[in-house]
Amino acid sequence: MCYKEEVQKKNGDKLQRRFEEDSVPKFIQTYFINIKSKKGAINYYIAIKDLLLWLMDKKIIDKTSLKDITPEDFYEVESEDVTLYLDNKEQSGMSPTTLETRKNIFSSFWKYLKRTKKCPVKENIIADVSYKGISSNNNIIKKFPSETQLKNMEEKIMKKKDEFIRVRNLIILRVLKGTGLRESELAGLDMSDLYLNEDIPYIKTIRKGKFREREAVPVYLTGDATSAIKEWLEYRSGLKNIIDMDAVFFNKNGKRLNENNIQDIFTTYGYGVTPHMIRHWYATVMANTGNLAFTQQQLGHSSVNTTVNNYTNGIYGMKDVLANM
Protein backbone atom coordinates (compact mmCIF):
# COMPACT_ATOMS: atom_id res chain seq x y z
CA MET A 1 0.00 0.00 0.00
CA CYS A 2 1.48 3.37 -1.06
CA TYR A 3 1.60 6.44 1.18
CA LYS A 4 -1.42 8.07 -0.44
CA GLU A 5 -3.52 4.97 0.08
CA GLU A 6 -2.33 4.72 3.69
CA VAL A 7 -3.41 8.32 4.36
CA GLN A 8 -6.81 7.67 2.76
CA LYS A 9 -7.28 4.53 4.84
CA LYS A 10 -6.19 6.28 8.03
CA ASN A 11 -8.65 9.13 7.47
CA GLY A 12 -11.38 6.69 6.45
CA ASP A 13 -10.87 4.77 9.69
CA LYS A 14 -10.90 8.03 11.65
CA LEU A 15 -14.20 9.03 10.06
CA GLN A 16 -15.73 5.65 10.82
CA ARG A 17 -14.64 5.89 14.46
CA ARG A 18 -16.40 9.24 14.71
CA PHE A 19 -19.54 7.71 13.27
CA GLU A 20 -19.39 4.92 15.84
CA GLU A 21 -18.60 7.21 18.77
CA ASP A 22 -21.49 9.53 17.85
CA SER A 23 -23.83 6.67 16.84
CA VAL A 24 -24.55 8.43 13.56
CA PRO A 25 -27.63 7.03 11.76
CA LYS A 26 -26.89 5.02 8.64
CA PHE A 27 -28.86 7.31 6.33
CA ILE A 28 -26.55 10.19 7.32
CA GLN A 29 -23.40 8.07 7.00
CA THR A 30 -24.40 7.16 3.45
CA TYR A 31 -23.96 10.78 2.34
CA PHE A 32 -20.21 10.61 2.96
CA ILE A 33 -19.61 7.59 0.70
CA ASN A 34 -19.33 9.73 -2.43
CA ILE A 35 -16.80 12.13 -0.91
CA LYS A 36 -13.63 10.59 -2.28
CA SER A 37 -11.21 12.52 -0.08
CA LYS A 38 -11.64 11.09 3.41
CA LYS A 39 -9.89 14.09 4.92
CA GLY A 40 -12.48 16.26 3.20
CA ALA A 41 -15.24 13.97 4.45
CA ILE A 42 -14.06 14.50 8.03
CA ASN A 43 -14.28 18.27 7.58
CA TYR A 44 -17.76 17.90 6.08
CA TYR A 45 -18.84 15.78 9.02
CA ILE A 46 -17.56 18.32 11.55
CA ALA A 47 -19.65 21.05 9.88
CA ILE A 48 -22.81 18.94 9.51
CA LYS A 49 -22.57 17.58 13.06
CA ASP A 50 -22.23 21.11 14.43
CA LEU A 51 -25.37 22.20 12.59
CA LEU A 52 -27.35 19.17 13.79
CA LEU A 53 -26.31 19.72 17.41
CA TRP A 54 -27.39 23.36 17.14
CA LEU A 55 -30.74 22.37 15.62
CA MET A 56 -31.32 19.95 18.51
CA ASP A 57 -30.29 22.55 21.07
CA LYS A 58 -32.84 24.98 19.62
CA LYS A 59 -35.51 22.24 19.58
CA ILE A 60 -35.92 22.61 15.83
CA ILE A 61 -35.04 18.94 15.69
CA ASP A 62 -36.78 17.58 18.76
CA LYS A 63 -34.15 15.01 19.70
CA THR A 64 -31.37 14.93 22.28
CA SER A 65 -28.79 12.79 20.48
CA LEU A 66 -27.50 12.31 16.94
CA LYS A 67 -28.38 8.62 17.10
CA ASP A 68 -32.06 9.46 17.53
CA ILE A 69 -32.35 11.64 14.43
CA THR A 70 -34.64 10.21 11.74
CA PRO A 71 -35.17 11.23 8.09
CA GLU A 72 -38.49 12.79 9.06
CA ASP A 73 -36.73 15.26 11.38
CA PHE A 74 -35.27 17.13 8.41
CA TYR A 75 -38.75 17.96 7.23
CA GLU A 76 -38.94 20.36 10.20
CA VAL A 77 -35.84 22.35 9.23
CA GLU A 78 -36.37 25.54 7.24
CA SER A 79 -34.00 27.88 5.43
CA GLU A 80 -34.50 30.54 8.11
CA ASP A 81 -33.15 28.11 10.72
CA VAL A 82 -29.91 27.63 8.81
CA THR A 83 -29.64 31.38 8.25
CA LEU A 84 -29.95 31.93 12.02
CA TYR A 85 -27.30 29.25 12.67
CA LEU A 86 -24.85 30.95 10.31
CA ASP A 87 -25.59 34.39 11.78
CA ASN A 88 -25.02 33.08 15.30
CA LYS A 89 -21.73 31.48 14.29
CA GLU A 90 -20.51 34.74 12.78
CA GLN A 91 -21.42 36.59 15.97
CA SER A 92 -19.44 33.98 17.90
CA GLY A 93 -16.33 34.78 15.87
CA MET A 94 -16.35 32.29 13.00
CA SER A 95 -15.12 33.94 9.81
CA PRO A 96 -17.58 34.71 6.99
CA THR A 97 -15.28 32.84 4.60
CA THR A 98 -15.53 29.67 6.71
CA LEU A 99 -19.28 30.11 7.00
CA GLU A 100 -19.65 30.45 3.24
CA THR A 101 -17.83 27.12 2.95
CA ARG A 102 -20.19 25.60 5.52
CA LYS A 103 -23.18 26.92 3.60
CA ASN A 104 -21.89 25.11 0.50
CA ILE A 105 -21.42 21.91 2.53
CA PHE A 106 -24.99 22.12 3.82
CA SER A 107 -26.25 22.66 0.27
CA SER A 108 -24.50 19.48 -0.84
CA PHE A 109 -25.96 17.58 2.13
CA TRP A 110 -29.52 18.79 1.45
CA LYS A 111 -29.21 17.83 -2.20
CA TYR A 112 -28.45 14.32 -0.97
CA LEU A 113 -31.44 14.38 1.40
CA LYS A 114 -33.67 15.48 -1.46
CA ARG A 115 -32.30 12.76 -3.74
CA THR A 116 -32.43 9.81 -1.36
CA LYS A 117 -35.67 7.86 -1.05
CA LYS A 118 -35.04 7.44 2.67
CA CYS A 119 -35.88 11.06 3.42
CA PRO A 120 -39.12 13.06 2.88
CA VAL A 121 -37.24 16.29 2.04
CA LYS A 122 -38.60 17.67 -1.24
CA GLU A 123 -36.35 20.67 -1.80
CA ASN A 124 -32.90 22.01 -1.07
CA ILE A 125 -33.72 24.62 1.56
CA ILE A 126 -30.16 25.99 1.50
CA ALA A 127 -30.95 27.66 -1.83
CA ASP A 128 -33.17 30.06 0.14
CA VAL A 129 -30.71 30.72 2.99
CA SER A 130 -30.25 34.49 3.07
CA TYR A 131 -26.88 34.52 4.86
CA LYS A 132 -24.15 35.93 2.63
CA GLY A 133 -20.64 34.99 3.62
CA ILE A 134 -17.45 36.11 1.97
CA SER A 135 -16.10 34.32 -1.07
CA SER A 136 -12.53 33.12 -0.59
CA ASN A 137 -11.68 35.21 -3.67
CA ASN A 138 -12.43 38.39 -1.71
CA ASN A 139 -9.72 37.38 0.74
CA ILE A 140 -7.12 36.76 -1.96
CA ILE A 141 -4.51 39.24 -0.73
CA LYS A 142 -4.25 37.31 2.54
CA LYS A 143 -3.78 34.05 0.68
CA PHE A 144 -0.46 34.57 -1.02
CA PRO A 145 2.83 35.64 0.51
CA SER A 146 4.73 38.77 -0.41
CA GLU A 147 8.11 38.55 -2.11
CA THR A 148 9.60 39.86 1.13
CA GLN A 149 8.10 36.99 3.14
CA LEU A 150 9.41 34.43 0.66
CA LYS A 151 12.87 35.98 0.70
CA ASN A 152 12.92 36.09 4.51
CA MET A 153 11.88 32.44 4.71
CA GLU A 154 14.65 31.40 2.33
CA GLU A 155 17.24 33.41 4.26
CA LYS A 156 16.15 31.87 7.57
CA ILE A 157 16.48 28.36 6.15
CA MET A 158 19.93 29.25 4.79
CA LYS A 159 21.10 30.04 8.32
CA LYS A 160 20.36 26.49 9.52
CA LYS A 161 23.66 24.81 10.42
CA ASP A 162 22.39 21.26 9.91
CA GLU A 163 23.23 20.62 6.24
CA PHE A 164 20.55 17.98 5.66
CA ILE A 165 17.76 20.16 7.08
CA ARG A 166 19.03 23.23 5.22
CA VAL A 167 19.31 21.52 1.84
CA ARG A 168 16.04 19.60 2.11
CA ASN A 169 13.96 22.55 3.29
CA LEU A 170 15.27 24.87 0.57
CA ILE A 171 14.50 22.22 -2.05
CA ILE A 172 10.97 21.76 -0.66
CA LEU A 173 10.33 25.51 -0.85
CA ARG A 174 11.55 25.63 -4.46
CA VAL A 175 9.46 22.61 -5.46
CA LEU A 176 6.30 24.03 -3.91
CA LYS A 177 6.90 27.38 -5.63
CA GLY A 178 7.37 25.58 -8.93
CA THR A 179 4.42 23.18 -8.77
CA GLY A 180 1.70 24.48 -6.45
CA LEU A 181 1.47 21.06 -4.82
CA ARG A 182 -0.56 20.52 -1.66
CA GLU A 183 1.27 19.24 1.43
CA SER A 184 -0.28 15.80 1.03
CA GLU A 185 0.83 15.63 -2.61
CA LEU A 186 4.40 16.61 -1.77
CA ALA A 187 4.55 14.14 1.13
CA GLY A 188 3.20 11.39 -1.12
CA LEU A 189 5.78 11.85 -3.87
CA ASP A 190 7.54 8.60 -4.75
CA MET A 191 10.71 8.20 -6.80
CA SER A 192 8.60 6.51 -9.47
CA ASP A 193 6.50 9.69 -9.76
CA LEU A 194 9.40 11.71 -11.20
CA TYR A 195 9.71 12.23 -14.96
CA LEU A 196 12.59 14.68 -15.14
CA ASN A 197 14.04 13.74 -18.53
CA GLU A 198 10.92 14.38 -20.60
CA ASP A 199 10.70 17.29 -23.07
CA ILE A 200 8.60 19.04 -20.42
CA PRO A 201 9.60 17.53 -17.05
CA TYR A 202 6.72 16.57 -14.77
CA ILE A 203 5.74 14.61 -11.70
CA LYS A 204 2.68 12.46 -11.13
CA THR A 205 0.36 12.91 -8.19
CA ILE A 206 -2.96 11.40 -7.14
CA ARG A 207 -5.92 13.74 -7.59
CA LYS A 208 -9.61 13.61 -8.35
CA GLY A 209 -10.09 12.85 -12.03
CA LYS A 210 -13.14 12.37 -14.19
CA PHE A 211 -16.26 11.30 -12.34
CA ARG A 212 -14.42 12.19 -9.09
CA GLU A 213 -12.39 8.98 -9.15
CA ARG A 214 -8.85 9.37 -7.85
CA GLU A 215 -6.18 8.96 -10.49
CA ALA A 216 -2.53 9.78 -11.20
CA VAL A 217 -2.22 13.04 -13.12
CA PRO A 218 0.85 14.97 -14.37
CA VAL A 219 1.96 18.25 -12.83
CA TYR A 220 4.51 20.01 -15.01
CA LEU A 221 7.59 21.56 -13.43
CA THR A 222 9.10 25.00 -13.75
CA GLY A 223 12.77 25.12 -14.65
CA ASP A 224 13.74 25.91 -11.07
CA ALA A 225 11.59 23.11 -9.64
CA THR A 226 13.22 20.66 -12.08
CA SER A 227 16.68 21.84 -11.07
CA ALA A 228 15.75 21.65 -7.39
CA ILE A 229 14.59 18.03 -7.62
CA LYS A 230 17.70 17.03 -9.59
CA GLU A 231 19.90 18.69 -6.96
CA TRP A 232 18.02 16.85 -4.23
CA LEU A 233 18.37 13.49 -5.97
CA GLU A 234 22.12 14.02 -6.27
CA TYR A 235 22.34 14.94 -2.58
CA ARG A 236 20.00 12.08 -1.68
CA SER A 237 22.24 9.55 -3.42
CA GLY A 238 24.95 10.20 -0.84
CA LEU A 239 22.72 9.52 2.17
CA LYS A 240 23.06 6.16 3.92
CA ASN A 241 20.16 5.92 6.36
CA ILE A 242 17.13 6.02 4.06
CA ILE A 243 14.42 3.68 5.35
CA ASP A 244 11.53 4.62 3.05
CA MET A 245 13.41 4.21 -0.22
CA ASP A 246 10.34 5.01 -2.34
CA ALA A 247 9.86 8.43 -0.72
CA VAL A 248 11.34 11.49 -2.41
CA PHE A 249 11.46 13.49 0.83
CA PHE A 250 12.13 12.12 4.30
CA ASN A 251 13.27 13.15 7.79
CA LYS A 252 16.69 12.71 9.39
CA ASN A 253 15.73 9.20 10.45
CA GLY A 254 15.13 8.23 6.84
CA LYS A 255 11.36 7.98 7.15
CA ARG A 256 8.95 9.65 4.73
CA LEU A 257 7.89 13.19 5.55
CA ASN A 258 4.19 13.55 6.30
CA GLU A 259 1.89 16.56 6.00
CA ASN A 260 2.50 17.65 9.59
CA ASN A 261 6.28 17.60 9.05
CA ILE A 262 5.91 19.89 6.05
CA GLN A 263 3.62 22.24 7.96
CA ASP A 264 6.17 22.31 10.79
CA ILE A 265 8.86 23.51 8.36
CA PHE A 266 6.70 26.50 7.51
CA THR A 267 5.82 27.13 11.15
CA THR A 268 9.54 27.28 11.96
CA TYR A 269 10.80 29.26 8.98
CA GLY A 270 7.79 30.75 7.25
CA TYR A 271 7.12 34.11 8.93
CA GLY A 272 3.40 33.37 8.67
CA VAL A 273 3.64 31.73 5.24
CA THR A 274 1.91 28.35 4.87
CA PRO A 275 2.24 25.67 2.18
CA HIS A 276 -1.25 26.53 0.95
CA MET A 277 -0.24 30.19 0.58
CA ILE A 278 2.59 29.02 -1.67
CA ARG A 279 -0.01 27.15 -3.73
CA HIS A 280 -2.03 30.36 -4.07
CA TRP A 281 1.13 32.27 -5.01
CA TYR A 282 1.98 29.72 -7.71
CA ALA A 283 -1.60 29.62 -9.00
CA THR A 284 -1.83 33.39 -9.23
CA VAL A 285 1.47 33.66 -11.10
CA MET A 286 0.31 30.96 -13.53
CA ALA A 287 -3.15 32.49 -14.00
CA ASN A 288 -1.65 35.87 -14.78
CA THR A 289 0.25 34.39 -17.72
CA GLY A 290 -3.16 34.18 -19.38
CA ASN A 291 -3.21 30.41 -19.96
CA LEU A 292 -6.12 29.54 -17.70
CA ALA A 293 -6.66 26.07 -19.16
CA PHE A 294 -3.09 25.10 -18.27
CA THR A 295 -3.42 26.65 -14.80
CA GLN A 296 -6.63 24.69 -14.24
CA GLN A 297 -4.85 21.47 -15.25
CA GLN A 298 -1.86 22.18 -13.02
CA LEU A 299 -4.03 22.83 -9.96
CA GLY A 300 -6.42 19.95 -10.56
CA HIS A 301 -9.53 22.14 -10.66
CA SER A 302 -12.64 20.50 -12.09
CA SER A 303 -13.66 23.73 -13.83
CA VAL A 304 -11.74 26.64 -15.32
CA ASN A 305 -14.29 28.90 -13.59
CA THR A 306 -12.78 27.90 -10.24
CA THR A 307 -9.40 29.05 -11.50
CA VAL A 308 -10.80 32.32 -12.85
CA ASN A 309 -12.78 33.12 -9.70
CA ASN A 310 -9.92 32.44 -7.32
CA TYR A 311 -6.72 33.44 -9.06
CA THR A 312 -7.27 36.08 -11.74
CA ASN A 313 -7.02 39.10 -9.50
CA GLY A 314 -5.40 42.45 -10.33
CA ILE A 315 -4.10 42.86 -6.77
CA TYR A 316 -1.38 40.26 -7.37
CA GLY A 317 2.09 41.76 -7.12
CA MET A 318 0.83 44.99 -5.56
CA LYS A 319 1.25 44.09 -1.87
CA ASP A 320 4.93 45.09 -1.71
CA VAL A 321 4.40 48.04 -4.07
CA LEU A 322 1.63 49.51 -1.94
CA ALA A 323 3.56 48.94 1.28
CA ASN A 324 6.55 50.88 -0.06
CA MET A 325 4.66 53.85 -1.54
Predicted regions mapped to residue ranges:
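N-terminal core-binding DNA-recognition domain of tyrosine recombinases/integrases
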Residues: 10, 24-39, 48-140, 159
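DNA breakage-rejoining catalytic core of tyrosine-based enzymes
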Residues: 75, 135-153, 211-223, 240-245
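Alpha-helix N-cap/helix-start motif at helix boundaries, enriched for small hydrophobics
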Residues: 106, 172-173, 180, 184-189, ...
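Basic, Lys/Arg- and aromatic-enriched nucleic-acid-binding interface segment
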Residues: 151-183
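Short basic/aromatic active-site micro-motif
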Residues: 167, 255, 271-289, 302, ...
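Conserved tyrosine-mediated DNA breakage-rejoining catalytic core shared by Y-recombinases
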Residues: 184, 188-228
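Short, polar N-cap/turn motifs at the start of nucleic acid-interacting alpha helices
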Residues: 194-196, 271-272, 290-315
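Active-site/catalytic core of tyrosine-dependent DNA strand-transfer enzymes
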Residues: 222-272
